[in-house]
Amino acid sequence: MRSPQPHRSGGDTQQHFQSTVSVQKLKRFNSLILVFRFAAFCFSLASAVFMLTNSRGSDSLHWYNFDAFRYVFAANAIVAIYSLFEMAASVWEISRNATLFPEICQVWFDFGHDQVFAYLLLSANTAGTELARTLKDTCTDNKAFCVQSDIAIVLGFAGFLFLGISSLFSGFRVVCFIINGSRFYV
């Protein structure tokens, strides 16, 4: 699948023969990206839900009373929404053999946003980890609150891991596009 953009010399791109094996490799690669994006979505959504439901009693601790926990919730919710969009784009690409946006925009959009949101998750979950460590001394009274906060943070780190792997794959697509003029080397 070559880029519809002309070569640097000004000529049009040539239509190259593409074997069935190449098409299958491309679909397999895109399916693998979809699996990692789905995992990032699931873990980020679960982390956001765990943090959102982390309140104990009316006079007790609430997650929204702590800036770091609000950051963990917001970052994971944003990444869950982004991952949902990227899953839809991946399904579109697998089913139609074409990207949602023009190919050059799609590869840079995917790579850039994967990087930004992966670092957002890493930053938020690191801040949440530091607060959770600080709260360990007070966890004798509110053990359930602390455990649920820890679970939300661990789920967020798992979301970061899968988003980071997706970022590696989207980086591979950027490099292939730069070298070949196509998002996948076939």
From Swiss-Prot:
| Keyword line | Cell membrane, Membrane, Transmembrane, Transmembrane helix
Xref: InterPro entries: CASP_dom
Cytoplasmic-facing ranges = 1-31, 93-103, 172-186
Q: Which residues lie on this side of the membrane: Extracellular?
A: 53-71, 125-150
Where is this protein localized, as stated in its record? Answer: Cell membrane
Keyword NAD listed: no
Answer yes or no on keyword Nucleotide-binding.
Answer: no
GO cellular component assignments: plasma membrane
**Mainly resides where?**
membrane
One Pfam family in the UniProt entry = CASP_dom
Q: Enumerate the transmembrane spans.
A: 32-52, 72-92, 104-124, 151-171
Q: Taxonomically, which superkingdom?
A: Eukaryota
Q: How does it assemble?
A: Homodimer and heterodimers.
Instruction: Quote the protein name from its UniProt record.
Output: CASP-like protein 4C2
Q: What is the lineage of its organism?
A: Eukaryota, Viridiplantae, Streptophyta, Embryophyta, Tracheophyta
